[in-house]
């Protein structure tokens, strides 16, 4: 069994070694000739899987992407060839949630916001959006939810139309897939017209897909703004050749790494491994818990005085988003966008640290922290 996998998929050799021979490739530059002998193809979002890429392969049995998004996969083509496909929905939901929380706390510190007095609009209430909503609500932050598809599927879902959300929200965070067709296309959902509907100081966070936000329209808005608009961008149009003119106007700029916690990336690998085992009717022998390294900090005893400022400081100790902003600004021109992603420093999720104490804030589990039993 020939297994071809993106070189940036963590633990892929450890998970898949018992299923066949694992060959690693550069996901951005892989060619059809390289994949000619692949029985199993494992990719990330930088690889466009389509007829051109698979033109020379006649033996492919499975395609998997270790990501939540699937807009880089031609699923119609795979279906025509009867090639099973799987993604990893929810694999990095906690990682992205922690990225947004840390970004919000940084913005609150920078601009002296009281987040409890802000209204935060979440566009897209899937695995990530719903998890973020629970975390924010646990912190008593008012949340507006925008997801027209979910509104049709779930009676009682409190949906706020995007146009209404634009007018009411103090902060908007995008968590939708990227779609160009259908009833609710998301490509350039935030464009020149919709950005004009925002409050003058409404903050924008995009940790979903770059083209959800029209980057040129955003730049024009920021350049013309009389009042400072806070912006957090983890994803960009035309990656890896991003619009560098935006950087001076963006508070937190990162290289599409919101979901790049060790757990988030490795969880995607594990999910594809489980799918392959099921497809091949092989027993599941490996698990993420067994393969993950022991974190640098395992346990922390907290006192009854442990409050939200301490939570924020602890979160920054585990992951400081300002580090990734500094890395992008320092190395983008000399090393490039993909280099930043490939050489991303290890980052553990909140759950890697077990908290114990006599009086623990009830909202900590909703943020993702692990409490001692």
Where are these regions (language model features)?
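N-terminal glycine-/charge-rich "phosphate-binding" loop or analogous flexible N-terminal tail
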Residues: 1-38
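Phosphate/diphosphate ligand-binding glycine-rich loop within oxidoreductases
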Residues: 40-113
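Phosphate-coordination loops involved in phosphoryl transfer and adenosine-cofactor binding
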Residues: 60, 116-119, 192, 201
């Amino acid at each position: 069994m020939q297994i071809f996998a993106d070189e940036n998929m963590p633990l892929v050799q450890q998970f898949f070694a018992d299923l066949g021979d694992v060959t690693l490739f550069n996901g951005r530059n892989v060619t059809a000739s390289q994949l000619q002998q692949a029985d199993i193809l494992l990719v990330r979002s930088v690889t466009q899987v389509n007829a051109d890429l698979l033109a020379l392969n006649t033996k492919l049995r499975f395609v998997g992407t270790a990501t939540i998004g699937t807009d880089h996969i031609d699923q119609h083509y795979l279906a025509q060839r009867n090639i099973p496909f799987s993604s990893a929905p929810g694999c990095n939901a906690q990682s992205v949630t922690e990225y947004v929380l840390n970004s919000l706390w940084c913005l609150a510190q920078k601009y002296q916001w009281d987040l409890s007095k802000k209204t935060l609009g979440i566009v897209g209430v899937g695995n990530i959006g719903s998890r973020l909503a629970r975390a924010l609500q646990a912190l008593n932050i008012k949340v507006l939810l925008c997801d027209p598809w979910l509104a049709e599927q779930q009676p009682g879902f409190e949906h706020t139309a995007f146009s209404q959300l634009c007018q009411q929200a103090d902060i908007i965070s995008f968590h939708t897939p990227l779609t160009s067709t259908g009833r609710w296309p998301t490509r350039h959902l935030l464009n020149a017209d919709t950005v004009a509907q925002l409050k003058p100081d409404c903050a924008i966070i995009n940790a979903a897909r770059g083209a959800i936000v029209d980057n040129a329209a955003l730049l024009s808005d920021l350049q013309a703004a009389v009042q400072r608009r806070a912006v957090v961008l983890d994803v960009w149009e035309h990656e890896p050749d991003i619009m560098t003119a935006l950087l001076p106007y963006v508070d937190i700029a990162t290289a599409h790494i919101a979901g790049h916690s060790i757990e988030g990336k490795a969880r995607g690998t594990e999910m594809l491994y489980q799918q392959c085992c099921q497809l091949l009717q092989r027993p599941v022998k490996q698990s993420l818990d067994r393969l993950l390294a022991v974190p640098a900090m395992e346990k922390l005893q907290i006192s009854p005085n442990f409050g939200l400022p301490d939570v924020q400081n602890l979160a920054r100790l585990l992951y400081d988003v300002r580090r990734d902003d500094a890395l992008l600004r320092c190395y983008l021109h000399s090393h490039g966008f993909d280099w930043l992603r490939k050489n991303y420093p290890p980052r553990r999720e909140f759950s890697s640290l077990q908290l114990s104490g006599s009086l623990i804030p009830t909202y900590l589990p909703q943020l993702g922290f692990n409490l001692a039993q």
